[in-house]
Amino acid sequence: MKIYIDFDDVICETAKYFTKIAKELFNIDVPYREVQFFNLQKSFDLSGEQYDELMKAGHIPENLLDYEETPGASEMINKWVDEGHEVFVVTGRPFDSYEPSRRWLDEHHLNRLPIYFVDKYGREMFKQDHTYNLTLEELYCMHFDFAIEDSPAAFEHVQHFKDCKVAVYDRPWNKQVEFPDESFVRCLDWQEIDRLWQQQAAFQIADLSI
């Protein structure tokens, strides 16, 4: 079976690192638990220029490599790969962050996972034709049985996958969001995500045996 996994704030603790950068750059002290919006410009009350500076700093290779792993992520993902499932990392990171992103995965024992970069949020200014880039249209043509996302802005994308259960990793910026439908389920940690996946896998197997 095929599994889609978002990168930031699902596999690694991106927002927590950005709160640190905002403090260092602008002396803006917003605790992680108070990051109420996926849009960090809004969460940190930044000007356009400040936001650009924040995003640039957050995607410097040495900073990307410093992001902490979300507890339990690599262990659970590797268990799924060992069970024979196809697992893909699908990220909305800037296309030019491929090398450090690939290295981060490799250093956290996720070297077996392919990673695809998709312009999920309309941030890319130029079309880039690399083997690791996908257009939204190409993404929508793919099939996934299970997806893990945290960003409300990305929910519309995973809705294109037919019969796909979506685990929403519980984060401050999605706590007040109304989910699109019953296929979206809030999970507090990777253990809950695994339980949801096992239920989905069992359902899929039972459905195929009918």
Residue ranges, per PLM feature:
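Short, basic/glycine-rich phosphate-binding loops at helix/coil junctions
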Residues: 43-60, 114
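Short, acidic loop-to-helix structural element flanking the phosphoryl-transfer center
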Residues: 61-89, 93-101
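Secondary-structure boundary motif
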Residues: 24, 82-83, 107, 160
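C-terminal cap/substrate-recognition subdomain and adjoining C-terminal extension
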Residues: 97-210
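Residue-level detector of short coil/turn "hinge" positions at structural boundaries
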Residues: 28-32, 87, 112, 146
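Residues within well-ordered alpha helices
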Residues: 21-22, 79, 104, 138
